[in-house]
Structures are given as C-alpha cells and as structure tokens.
Amino acid sequence: MPKYTYLAFLLLFVSFLFFSCKEQHKIYRQATTIIEGQITSANSNIISLYGDVDIKSPMNQDGKFRISTELNKAGIYSLLVETQPIYVFIVPGDKISITGDIRTIATEAKFDGDHVNENNYLVRFESLKLETQPENLDSFFTQQEDDFIATVESRTTKLNTDQQEYQKKNGLFDGVFADMLVHEIVYDEAVVKMNYPSYFKYLNPEKSFKLSDTYDSFLQNIDTDSESNLMIPSYKKFLLMYLEFKIQNSSISGANPAYIKKFNFVQKSFQNKKVKEILFYEVMKQSINESINDAELLISDYNKLQTNEVYLAEINDMINKWSILLKGKKAPHFSYKALNGKTVRIEDLLGKVVYIDVWATWCVPCLRELPFLEKLQEDLKNNDMTFLSISIDNDQVAWRSMVKNKKMKGIHLIAENDWKSNIVADYLITDIPRFIIIGRDGNIINSNAPRPSSEKIRSELTEALGS
C-alpha cells in the first residue's frame, strides 16, 4: 500500500543497522567499575545493580551510595531503588555518578563521569517513550489492524529520528551503545505489536477477532535467542511476550495448562543456555503467581531442566511459600464487616461454593470485571453458591457509595488496612482484582481463579459445584 512505502523503507534501513551491527559482542577485560551518587526522597536504604550482575548496595540516610565491582561486559544496566529502575550504560572500568530525586529520576537523572552523552540520552529516551505512548490505551488497542500497525510504526520512526538528531547535536554514541539502542527500539516495537491481540480481545469481548496471516511477519528477522541481547532493557520483556504470543496465536499442540506448553516451547525453540535458564525461571515464577495448582504440575520438570542454582533455589522457596494455597488446603480465615455493619466470617459460608472477588473502587481492571461478574451471578443464581466481594479500599465512604449506586449484588465486605489487611497477606495478593474459589467444605479449590470475563470461569465453577 502506498502509505506504507516510506515506513517500509525506514524499517528496511533500521533492519540493516539491526542485523549488521555486531559490536555488542566486543570482549572487554575485567575492570573495576564504580557507580556512585545520591538519590533523594527514597524510602529504601538499598540500591541494586542488575545486568550481567546482581548486586545490592546500601544507601545512607541522605541517599548517597557507592557501588564498586568488577565488570567484563558493556551494556545497559539497571539501577533499582524501591521499584524504580534507572537505566545506565556502563563499560568495564567506567566511573559514573548519578543524582536525582526518586520521584522524577527516571526522566530527570543527572549524570557525570564516563559516557555522559549516552546516559543523558537514556534519560531523554525514557521520557520520549512516555511522551509517545498513546493517551488512550483503549482506543489505541481497539484500532483495526492496519491502523494499529501504522500508529506503532509512526512511534518507532519518532524514536529513531530523535536519537539520530541527538547525535548530530551532541556527538556520536559509543558503538556498542548505538547498536543496543537500535535493538532496544526494535524489541520495544515488537512487544507493543505482540500485545495487540490479547488487548483487542479483552477490550472487545463481543467482537470476533482474527489476525491477518502476515501480522507476525515483524518477528521473522528478529533475534529471539541471544545471550548478548540480555543487556538490552526490552529484550527480556520481549522474550516473555514472544513466548505468550506464540502460545496464544498458534496451533501449538500439547497438554494443558498453557504453562506446560510454554515449557515445551522453550525446550524446543531456544538453544542458548542462559536464555533458557531465564525463560524456565520466568515461566515458573509466573505460573506460581497465577496458579499454584498448575505450578505443582511443573515443578518436577523445572527441577530437571533448570541449570541455574540460584533460580532453582528461588523457585523452590516460592513453591514452599505458596503451598498453603494449594487445592485442598484449608482456606485461610478472614472476618470482615458487611455494609450493614455485621461481621461475616469465612466459616459462616460453609456449605456453599464461594467465589471471592478482592477488589477496590479505584482499580480500573476491577471495575472492568463488574459487568461480567453481574452476568455470572445472574447465570448461576439458582446454584448452591455465594458471590463474595471484599474491598481493600481505604475510603469506606467511596466503597459504600459505589456498591449502593451500582446496585452490586452478592455479599460485600470491607477489609481493614487495605494492602496490609489479613486477606492480602494470607492469600499472597500482590495485585487486584484477585478471584478465589472455596469449596463447600471450606477448602481451597483455586486461590487464583479465572476472572468473570474469562472463558474458563463457567466450567471451573460448574466443576466446583459438582464436586
């Protein structure tokens, strides 16, 4: 199509850069490398350096820190304070200083020392990525395929043009950094494109959806199995999204659940040892967090396939932690007040299957589920089950108002202490909405059950009612 002629040329040019530059494989001598500085307004007294290393270092009460370590690999490392990553390009032997306020440091960090030009651009690059993100994700991901592709590639053009213009004004980048930046932009675009099918279907559950046969052509020339690319921020995110995309949008056969398919796909499709270690670890971690019941089916294979001792130990620790929430275990006790002020305990619900929704009025994904939850309640109203919603709102007035104004059905409770409430701690809840199925006997059936919008929920509840 004519409107894509320029974009096609640009992508061809970027692809040439992407696949002809090999300088990231340059071998460096191990050298003492120093990263120091001051990060104010942080609540944490620990700063971590990730990349080819995993280092934790103390920060004093003023936010000052100093990391001195031996490195032999150049790349875009990540400094992490609390949950805030700060990307830093480091070459072995560098001495780099960074200052800023934790609240704005991702887009306003100040650098001094070696590779200032590259690191200043990383700050600019993160700002530009935020600026070029769509303002309305709903309308962005519900575009028709051709329009969506054009929008995404327009953003890529801006990112590529900006780094070229920056170098004209401020001098050429280090060759390794320049190559990694090209890779970063390509992987970033691929992640957005791979998100399209799942977001479109989530936002348009009533619409039929099918990708064109050529939609995934952007993956054909992308390196999916490269240890050196692990030093590029978006590569790890790309790997995980690539795995999800391949499983969801192909006819890959194999046993359910999806995590077993993912394990099989990693085993067959990846050769690099370190990449496989990371993928096995991430798939297992995701499985534990989303379905400890499924994770139990994988742990034996994981222990055989995982060659990284640190990853092996960490996953087994997670399994032990989550084992209290396995199917058949007694559901952890809770006792909270309802709208009418009466206290409802989990023991009061024995004899019926209970579908629990842990939510909050400020949680947008929670609110998206409400129409589906209402439909589910209506469809199953003649069954022997209870729909229980537990809010972790800090604002009880907002909670009461929403439940009454929306005429929400079922039993509604409010958990005291929001994220520090017992139900959050006992059920290992890190994000909401979280759905839980408890059997008539008070034992767990699924501690991380499908959402009401899921195609799986009706069959799972039907099975629970029949047990």
Residue ranges and their predicted role:
Residues 368-406, 419-425:
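Structural microenvironment flanking redox-active thiols in thiol-disulfide oxidoreductases
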Residues 206-219, 256-266, 294-303, 332-333:
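Alpha-helical repeat scaffolds
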Residues 17-20:
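C-terminal motif of bacterial Sec signal peptides marking the signal peptidase cleavage site
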Residues 23-180, 184, 191-195, 200-202:
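A non-transmembrane, solvent-exposed segment enriched in polar/low-complexity residues
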Residues 350, 358-375:
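Conserved redox-active cysteine motifs that mediate thiol-disulfide chemistry
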Residues 437-467:
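Thiol-/selenol-based redox modules, centered on thioredoxin-like
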Residues 275-337, 342, 347-352, 378, ...:
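N-proximal helix/coil linker or "cap" segments that precede and/or mark the start of modular domains
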Residues 337, 400-434, 440-441:
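Short, internal strand/loop/helix patches
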